[in-house]
C-alpha cells in the first residue's frame, strides 16, 4: 500500500519497478512545497499493491529511506549506498539522483522526472 508523506510535498520524481519477490514498488521523491501536490501528479502515483519509499529533500541535503530496498534487491557497494543515504560533500543533489538512476538502470525500472 502506498504510504503518503506526512508533510505536504511536491513529487520531484517517481520510480516504479518490480521487487525480486514479485511485488511492485514505488520510489517517490518529494520536495518540500507549501502549495500541495497537484492532482494530476497524484494520479500518476500507483495505489494499492505497491511499496512506497519516500525520499526527502530539504535545504540541499537529501535523505533516502531506501536502504531496505537497496540491500534487498540491488547489489550495490557500500560507497554507493553511503552516497545515497548520507550527507556527503563529494556528491551534490543532482549527482546523487544521477547515481540512483545508474544503480536502477540495469533493472526493469520506469523513471519519471
Language model: regions and residue ranges:
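Domain-length accessory/inserted modules outside core catalytic folds
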Residues: 1-25, 32-113
